[in-house]
């Protein structure tokens, strides 16, 4: 099986533009994945992506999460204890994003300067936070052009 990080590297580093990412409508990250692979996760430019599901206990080493320029995304689900140590979360220019669900201990927080930035999310109706999600959040920044 090709790992998610290898697919991302292939999409980003290929000499000629690849349009595979233009047709992906759903990404599901299996539980217990990518805990030591990266310190920053920046996902952008998946124009057809409608749903992002991150399983439980994923991306344990990620300090910052940026989701941006995904014009079709409607739903983000972050599984239990995923992105546990993340201190910076940015959701930017996601015009159709309707809701974000964070399960128990997801995005717990990465210390005294943890921040959540929401920029240009005109369709956002709800953020569900279960249990200890966002428990160490210190800064909430909302910027809107709508």
Regions found by a protein language model. Give the residues of each.
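Feature marks extracellular polysaccharide-active and adherence modules
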Residues: 30, 55, 68, 79, ...
């Amino acid at each position: 099986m090709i790992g998610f990080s290898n697919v991302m590297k292939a999409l980003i580093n290929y000499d000629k533009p690849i349009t595979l990412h233009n047709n992906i409508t759903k990404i599901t990250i299996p539980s217990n994945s990518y805990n030591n692979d990266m310190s920053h996760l920046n996902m952008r430019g998946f124009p057809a992506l409608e749903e992002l599901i991150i399983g439980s206990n994923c991306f344990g080493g990620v300090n910052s999460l940026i989701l941006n320029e995904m014009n079709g995304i409607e739903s983000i689900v972050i599984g239990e204890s995923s992105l546990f140590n993340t201190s910076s979360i940015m959701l930017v220019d996601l015009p159709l994003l309707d809701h974000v669900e964070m399960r128990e201990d997801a995005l717990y927080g990465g210390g005294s300067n943890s921040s959540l930035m929401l920029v240009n999310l005109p369709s956002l109706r709800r953020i569900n936070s279960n249990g200890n999600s966002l428990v160490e959040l210190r800064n909430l920044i909302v910027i809107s052009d709508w």
